[in-house]
Amino acid sequence: MAEITSAKAMARTVRVSPRKSRLVLDNIRGKSVADAIAILTFTPNKAAEIILKVLNSAVANAENNFGLDKANLVVSEAFANEGPTMKRFRPRAKGSASPINKRTAHITVAVAEK
């Protein structure tokens, strides 16, 4: 049986746009966990807070479920998929209304040993 060397965590239906999430995820992909945490801590972005939580969850999964060492972990996968869109309307002039799409994302972060 092969030894498990990776763990992942997901946050589903998060109220942040997947497009904006990807901008932050691109910064941490391939980095060590310590570097990724430092980057996310100082990124002034709503998505960064959520991604930091998911990253910490993935690290905890690796340590508790698979006995991996945090010092050797690298962010192997980081991606955001589109979640369900909440459709809303904004009232406009002359009794009309404009549609507003409030987008959500499914964020996945995977960590693996070097």
From Swiss-Prot:
CDD domains associated with the record: Ribosomal_L22
Effect of A93E: Confers antibiotic resistance
Gene3D superfamilies from the UniProt entry: Ribosomal protein L22/L17
Self-association and partners: Part of the 50S ribosomal subunit.
Gene Ontology MF terms in the entry: rRNA binding; structural constituent of ribosome
Pfam families assigned: Ribosomal_L22
Name under which the protein is recorded: Large ribosomal subunit protein uL22
Biological processes annotated in GO: response to antibiotic; translation
UniProtKB keywords: Antibiotic resistance, Ribonucleoprotein, Ribosomal protein, RNA-binding, rRNA-binding
InterPro entries reported for this sequence: Ribosomal_uL22, Ribosomal_uL22_bac/chlpt-type, Ribosomal_uL22_bac/org-type, Ribosomal_uL22_CS, Ribosomal_uL22_sf
Source species of the chain: Streptococcus pneumoniae serotype 4 (strain ATCC BAA-334 / TIGR4)
Top-level taxon of origin: Bacteria
Record note on what altering P99Q does: In strain: 4ERY; confers antibiotic resistance
Function text: This protein binds specifically to 23S rRNA; its binding is stimulated by other ribosomal proteins, e.g. L4, L17, and L20. It is important during the early stages of 50S assembly. It makes multiple contacts with different domains of the 23S rRNA in the assembled 50S subunit and ribosome. The globular domain of the protein is located near the polypeptide exit tunnel on the outside of the subunit, while an extended beta-hairpin is found that lines the wall of the exit tunnel in the center of the 70S ribosome.
GO CC, alphabetical: cytosolic large ribosomal subunit
HAMAP family attached to this UniProt entry: Ribosomal_uL22_B
Stored SUPFAM superfamilies: Ribosomal protein L22 (SSF54843)
Sequence similarity: Belongs to the universal ribosomal protein uL22 family.
Phenotype for G95D: In strain: 3ERY and 5ROX; confers antibiotic resistance
